Amino acid sequence: MGVTKKPDLNDPVLRAKLAKGMGHNYYGEPAWPNDLLYIFPVVILGTIACNVGLAILEPSMIGEPADPFATPLEILPEWYFFPVFQILRTVPNKLLGVLLMASVPLGLFTVPFLENVNKFQNPFRRPVATTVFLIGTAVALWLGIGATLPIDKSLTLGLF
């Protein structure tokens, strides 16, 4: 590697460029050729290597052949439907269950509008949106884990 000259931060032209936000990286370093020729291929090849490595180390099994006459005791949906499945399973009234299930995307739709006047991107400076996100994540994990358990242990996760 060659010797890299450090920029002179006392240079008024460079200070004006940095004040305007010009440049992609530190000190106004351009994205071409550094990012596009070095960082992006490394990230792409690293991602491909991770996927190939996981496919070799943990191959997915085909499983046993389907038998239409042997129905499992409880049919579970795909993992990303576990929280709403748990809502439908535990709420006694079907209409209330459907309304609660419909409130999930409506609640997600309102999250960007919480504190939208706040210009900060730091989560610690946006307490309402951060709290809603953390509580929503905890509830989704709780419902998702509970959906994999029997119905009598699903709400308490078998802890109580």
From Swiss-Prot:
Q: Where in the cell is it found?
A: Plastid, Chloroplast thylakoid membrane
Any keyword Plastid?
A: yes
State the protein's purpose. Component of the cytochrome b6-f complex, which mediates electron transfer between photosystem II (PSII) and photosystem I (PSI), cyclic electron flow around PSI, and state transitions.
The record's family statement is: Belongs to the cytochrome b family. PetD subfamily.
| Name this polypeptide is given | Cytochrome b6-f complex subunit 4
| Keywords on record | Chloroplast, Electron transport, Membrane, Photosynthesis, Plastid, Thylakoid, Transmembrane, Transmembrane helix, Transport
TM regions (residue ranges): 36-56, 95-115, 131-151
Q: Name one GO cellular component term.
A: chloroplast thylakoid membrane
Encoding gene, per UniProt annotation: petD
Q: How does it sit in the membrane?
A: Multi-pass membrane protein
Q: Show the GO MF annotations.
A: electron transporter, transferring electrons within cytochrome b6/f complex of photosystem II activity; electron transporter, transferring electrons within the cyclic electron transport pathway of photosynthesis activity; oxidoreductase activity
- Any one Gene Ontology BP term: photosynthetic electron transport chain
Major site of localization recorded for this protein: plastid
Q: How does it assemble?
A: The 4 large subunits of the cytochrome b6-f complex are cytochrome b6, subunit IV (17 kDa polypeptide, petD), cytochrome f and the Rieske protein, while the 4 small subunits are petG, petL, petM and petN. The complex functions as a dimer.
Q: Which InterPro entries match?
A: Cyt_b/b6_C (IPR005798), Cyt_b/b6_C_sf (IPR036150), Cyt_b6/f_cplx_suIV (IPR005870), Cytochrome_b_C_euk/bac (IPR048260)
Question: NCBIfam families from the entry?
Answer: cytb6_f_IV
